[in-house]
Amino acid sequence: MGLYVSRLFNRLFQKKDVRILMVGLDAAGKTTILYKVKLGEVVTTIPTIGFNVETVEFRNISFTVWDVGGQDKIRPLWRHYYSNTDGLIFVVDSNDRERIDDAREELHRMINEEELKDAIILVFANKQDLPNAMSAAEVTEKLHLNTIRERNWFIQSTCATRGDGLYEGFDWLTTHLNNAK
């Protein structure tokens, strides 16, 4: 009985530390998302050369979020951030129809990596406020998300500048990371 109560207490009240890797093509909105969730406000961003790392507290989880630049010359460096990753946030510019195939290739390249085999996947279909943005269903189709088997994944429509959908995405991450560990 004591062990059960101890486990229940730890599950409900103890902070859990998790490592999140947030990637996507350049200008998808990764840094805007990171600081909107961290600070609750939109900050002026410049293209990320290298990475930003911040700790975000959400419910009972302390997320260490690594926001890695998405320019094509930087993408080969993503693999250096894979180790010990619990969750992958892949950010897509839903308005960028010309590069959605590039986004799909990068996402599938990553999920086939051995070091990321246990990471859960959250896709943020960002920039939903733009008039020609693809819906989450269309992004799901274009990224071939339904071909991802034996992996937990979820897609969330977002507008980083307004904060729409961000907390719902982190809520999904929290629920699934709590169940996984």
From Swiss-Prot:
Gene Ontology BP annotations: intracellular protein transport; vesicle-mediated transport
Cellular compartments annotated: Golgi apparatus membrane
Lipid-bearing positions (N-myristoyl glycine): 2
Pfam families attached to this UniProt entry: Arf
Any Gene Ontology CC annotation: cytoplasm
Keyword Transmembrane helix attached: no
Regulation: Alternates between an inactive GDP-bound form and an active GTP-bound form. Intrinsic GTPase activity is almost undetectable in vitro. Activated by a guanine nucleotide-exchange factor (GEF) and inactivated by GTPase-activating protein ARFGAP1.
UniProt-annotated stretches for the region Important for the stable binding to the membranes: 3-16
Molecular functions per Gene Ontology: GTP binding; GTPase activity
Protein name: ADP-ribosylation factor 1
Gene: ARF1
